[in-house]
Amino acid sequence: MTETDQTPDTAPEAAPEVAPIVSDDLAPLRAKTIVLVGLMGVGKSSVGRRLANVLGLPFRDADNEVEAAAGRSISEIFAELGEPAFRDGERRVIARLLDEPPHVLATGGGAFVNAETRALINEKAVSVWLKADVELLARRVSRKDNRPLVRGKDPVKVLTELAEARYPAYAEAQVHVETGDTPHMVAVEAILTALRQAHA
């Protein structure tokens, strides 16, 4: 048999063995926007980008979208307009994003606390609470100076207070995932497993 003879026999069979398995496995997870919620430093943006890549979905970061809409950074919005103005802009931006085709959306730590936003997310998307120990989150956020809520303060104290205030709202997320101090792709696999179980 010549090389030319072999090509028609083997090539058509190779693709169906792999592609449909991946497609069928992940297709249900692509049907709705996946919204990541949780405290600052838990990895919503970094893990979210990788999750979007695995699913073949666009990635959106609500904080970046708020900055683009306001024409200034989150820190500037907090300093010049105050937190209430930021939260109002955040709510409107998330509502707009939820009307877009399915994507992975990373939200700010306080977004899901807003009852209106929380209800809208749970209605139009799949909400995923990423959770990790406060001490771990404090170590992460202390490495950067771009978090207005912890700048110049004890991050453990701030995050502990935020956890007490926000966890009841986060608990209303449809999927809960403990991420811990793991590589980003391990967290992605944990999210995918939890999403599959939720769709089962």
UniProtKB/Swiss-Prot annotation:
Q: How is the cofactor bound?
A: Binds 1 Mg(2+) ion per subunit.
Going by the record, the broad EC class of this enzyme is transferase
Pfam families in the cross-refs: SKI
Keywords, sorted A to Z: Amino-acid biosynthesis, Aromatic amino acid biosynthesis, ATP-binding, Cytoplasm, Kinase, Magnesium, Metal-binding, Nucleotide-binding, Transferase
Q: Which GO terms describe its molecular function?
A: ATP binding; magnesium ion binding; shikimate kinase activity
Q: Entry's CDD domains?
A: SK (cd00464)
Cofactor requirements of the protein: Mg(2+)
UniProt: Mg(2+) binding residues: 45
EC annotation from Swiss-Prot or TrEMBL: 2.7.1.71
Q: What's its catalytic activity?
A: shikimate + ATP = 3-phosphoshikimate + ADP + H(+)
Query: Where the protein is mainly located, per its record?
Result: cytoplasm
Q: In which pathway does it act?
A: Metabolic intermediate biosynthesis; chorismate biosynthesis; chorismate from D-erythrose 4-phosphate and phosphoenolpyruvate: step 5/7
Instruction: Enumerate the residues binding ATP.
Output: 41-46, 147
Q: Which domain of life is it from?
A: Bacteria
Query: Where does the record say this protein resides?
Result: Cytoplasm
Instruction: Read off the Gene3D superfamilies from this record.
Output: P-loop containing nucleotide triphosphate hydrolases
Gene Ontology cellular component annotations, sorted alphabetically = cytosol
Where substrate binds, per the record, is at: 63, 87, 109, 166
Supply one GO BP term: amino acid biosynthetic process
Subunit relationships: Monomer.
Q: What does the function comment of this entry state?
A: Catalyzes the specific phosphorylation of the 3-hydroxyl group of shikimic acid using ATP as a cosubstrate.
- Which PANTHER family is this protein grouped with? SHIKIMATE KINASE, SHIKIMATE KINASE 1, CHLOROPLASTIC
- Can you tell me which family this protein belongs to? Belongs to the shikimate kinase family.
- Its protein name is Shikimate kinase
Supply the source organism for this entry. Answer: Caulobacter vibrioides (strain NA1000 / CB15N)
Q: Gene name on record?
A: aroK
